[in-house]
Amino acid sequence: KLIESNAKRLNIPVTIFESDIFESVFNVEKSPCYLCARMRRGHLYSKAKELGCNKIALGHHYDDVIETILMGMLYGAQMQTMMPKLHSTNFEGMELIRPLYLIREDDIKAWRDANELKFIQCACRFTDTCSSCAEDGQSKSKRLEVKKLIAELKKTNPFVEGNIFKSVENVNLSTIV
């Protein structure tokens, strides 16, 4: 209902559909977030094709991008990023776009508040805003952990976020193993 209410307030047509993704990944211990994201994207591509669309738009923003870069390095032992636009390899003729790619999370929250909107949080137990806390009150969310690390780094380097973002564009291949 919250999504429908926001869409109505902004005069945006919306199509809501159900899936069993959360139940499918709930008991997966290794990489449930990755699996869930892949499954959600697959469902979105399928529904978009069914509706005659050739693109899906995701709400990832600048802060998501820099957190993903660090998460890949620190927890996945790889250099990776989110791209603002992708051509699907599994759904012919489909594209994924991230229109908020360069928008800061705080700016999105300010816009939300100025427009008196309410955002839903992920219904998953692994996210930083839901039931992802251990018994000692510490979050098990790697994204929240990285978000806190970035906040600490900003205390001594105000350019750290921009540097992380640019790091995947400024790769010196002659120094890579």
Where in this protein do the model-derived segments appear?
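Domain-wide signal for the mature, well-folded portions of proteins, strongly enriched
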Residues: 4, 13-14, 70-73, 138-144, ...
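Conserved active-site and cofactor/substrate-binding residues in soluble primary-metabolism enzymes
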Residues: 39, 141, 159
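AMP-forming adenylation/ATP pyrophosphatase catalytic core
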Residues: 39-40, 86-93, 169-177
